[in-house]
A protein has these predicted regions:
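Short amphipathic C-terminal alpha-helix that caps PH/PH-like domains
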Residues: 188-192
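Non-catalytic beta/alpha edge segments that cap or flank active sites
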Residues: 203-207
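Hydrophobic helix-and-loop "lid/oligomerization" segment in the mid-to-C-terminal part
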Residues: 7-186, 197-198, 208, 214-219
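Acidic low-complexity segments
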Residues: 221-223
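Short, exposed "boundary/linker" segments that immediately precede the start
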Residues: 1-6
Length: 223
């Protein structure tokens, strides 16, 4: 709502942001906001430059807004590149694991950016249909983690049960964040998997499709 309201206030902002998002030849819809405009503003916060988004939202000067919008677009491209590289590395690590034994995927790397791991964790959670914890080990030797879960597994409660291993954590049943020293990551991996096997069954790790209604083939037509 804030973004849409601001778009209505400043002509310079929607034009410049829409230009870099490639949606100037059509009326801006909620889809354009959700998938074109908002991700570019979101990217600056994830990559540690939130002031760019704030300055753009406050700008009423077209040239200034255009410059800021281009910077946001470049940051969004960087975020997408980081996400692809991180997902490739994470999937390579997953290939080395026995998924019959690993009910929770706990992965860590010094190559990852803590502002991007949440998106990658969500993608891996959807692809492998099991709880995922990705940890970016930062220069201060602290791991910043992002967790995503599946239905029936409260990831906040799971982390609460291992809180003695964590420097900090917070979240809710489907998603959480945490801080941890690298030396405790292996133990966290082991403990979370033990906890998951007490809370889940193998069938919980099988993706389910939601069906609105069952119909017979002869009931369908092209009309």
């Amino acid at each position: 709502y804030t973004l849409v309201y601001t778009l209505s206030l400043h002509d310079a902002l929607p034009i410049s942001l829409a230009e870099v998002a490639g949606c100037t030849d059509t009326e801006i819809s909620t889809g354009h906001v959700g998938y074109g405009l908002a991700p570019r503003i979101n990217a600056c916060g994830r990559l540690g430059k939130p002031e760019l988004g704030v300055n753009l939202l406050l700008s009423s000067n077209y040239e200034v807004a255009q410059k800021l919008a281009q910077e946001l677009d470049d940051l969004n491209d960087s975020r997408q590149d980081m996400s692809r590289e991180m997902q490739e590395e994470a999937e390579a690590l997953i290939e080395q694991q026995n998924l019959e034994e690993k009910w929770v995927l706990v992965l860590a790397s010094k190559n990852w950016h803590s502002g991007v791991i949440g998106n990658v964790a969500s993608d891996l959670n959807e692809k492998y249909h099991r709880p995922v914890v990705l940890i970016a080990i930062e220069e201060n030797n602290i791991g910043k983690g992002s967790a995503r879960s599946i239905s029936g597994f409260n990831i906040h409660d799971a982390l609460l049960a291992q809180q003695e291993l964590l420097k900090a954590f917070g979240g809710h049943k489907q998603a959480a964040g945490l801080s941890i020293v690298p030396e405790e990551i292996e133990t966290l991996d082991k403990k979370l998997n033990q906890y998951a096997k007490q809370q889940l069954t193998p069938s919980d790790l099988v993706p389910r499709k939601k069906v609105d209604v069952a119909v017979e083939l002869e009931q369908l037509s092209f009309a």
